[in-house]
């Protein structure tokens, strides 16, 4: 009755009454008895029954996941099959399926068109504010801001007393260069635009009136186009003069003199100028001649029998020719000292001064001197102060940039020569050809040739080679007959072999300047290159510290590598320190 009164609102059934019955708790004696009792052994049938009862109460998640995955896979398979069956587009469609019929855009087309017009007007206002690019403007529209942007774009700097002319925007716009010479440059030789050093040098080195052109001190990297930078002003000046007959050329000698440190560079410049003269089709019979060591005096005499307008020579050989009275320097109007820093490094400073003393003093006022260098050392500055009159200083890039095109520098700690050879073979295969391998001793050239000639076409270049052998080696590398040149420092300057992919310093140079000019054989004219240097651990620590700093500071491709192992061996301490947080 008590229960019925408490739950009188509930409808009671027999089942609910049965469920409400309270079972009597297990007797404590039975619990103690079951605890002390031993294990109960179950038969096989009993164990199977217990397992089945438990399995019925649990959900197998693995089975459920497998079922779901099977369903999804079946759906994907069916979709894939339907896609395979409908590879071709079906153009026979029912017009009733057109979902755009009766489409009403949320934005009114008229309003949308107004928005677009406002956006266009905003672009026009921005363009009016910023102005057109200097490339899009006419020459008369250029202002100081445009010229400043152009100089920054090509990394051109210039300084000097007096007015400095603006850089060339193209070959023909300012009419500084003769029209037919411009046509030879663009159509005959395929030079679409001037390089940075040409842009700033040419307009300032060519006089617009009959006055003597300005002296130039130029700082630029190898492969930057210096040859045309001084050749075009020379040719423009010669073009303004009357044609000279052969006997007058022989009597007065050349009108332009170019001094260079190596015979290879002299021949290269001569070929480049004569190429331009051939494309120019100038009627004045202008010609360029190079005289270098390795040719006999009779050969040089035969070369100079008809005189020349432009003479390219190394200092030592030119002195020999002057002593033998094969040429005179009475009428030099244009003097070029190319790679002046290298000529000084090679000990040609006294020879240069001796040659300059042969130039007649009364012609000094009418002579233009152009000096080009990769590095502006104190010796070069001394030469410039002594022989240049109020020069215009022009440079392309920073001091570091003047020594580095797009070169990735890699340093390897190799150990002995056998390990070096193993690295060398891998680098030649991995980094591409043609390649130049620099060594310090000519005996090493023979040793390497013996071990590499089975896989590569090798030519060598060192001091024991005759002039004909040197010229043949360079020509083979240029033509592709050979793909590896092994050379001492004699080839580090002046060589212009296109598309050199790899430079290997098999033996580190004794001077750091030589290292710079070795690696400058690759990465020329805007192309990328790789320079690999092998170190054994026996090199001069001070030299390697310079190398480490240069590799760190000059990294245009952000791929340079100077291994920590080398840094530790040579005691090179990083300037940065890990911060300690307490």
Curated annotation (Swiss-Prot):
PROSITE patterns (alphabetical): DEAD_ATP_HELICASE, HELICASE_ATP_BIND_1, HELICASE_CTER, Q_MOTIF
Binding site for ATP: 220-227
Biological process, per Gene Ontology: mRNA 5'-splice site recognition
Domain Helicase C-terminal: 416-570
Cleaved signal peptide residues: none
GO MF, any single term: ATP binding
The organism's place on the tree of life at top rank: Eukaryota
Gene3D superfamilies xrefs: P-loop containing nucleotide triphosphate hydrolases
Places the protein is found: Cytoplasm; Nucleus
Role description: ATP-dependent RNA helicase involved in mRNA splicing. May destabilize the U1/5'-splice site duplex to permit an effective competition for the 5'-splice site by the U6 snRNA, resulting in the switch between U1 and U6 at the 5'-splice site. May also act to unwind the U4/U6 base-pairing interaction in the U4/U6/U5 snRNP, facilitating the first covalent step of splicing.
Name of the featured protein: Pre-mRNA-splicing ATP-dependent RNA helicase PRP28
Naturally occurring in which organism (per UniProt): Candida glabrata (strain ATCC 2001 / BCRC 20586 / JCM 3761 / NBRC 0622 / NRRL Y-65 / CBS 138)
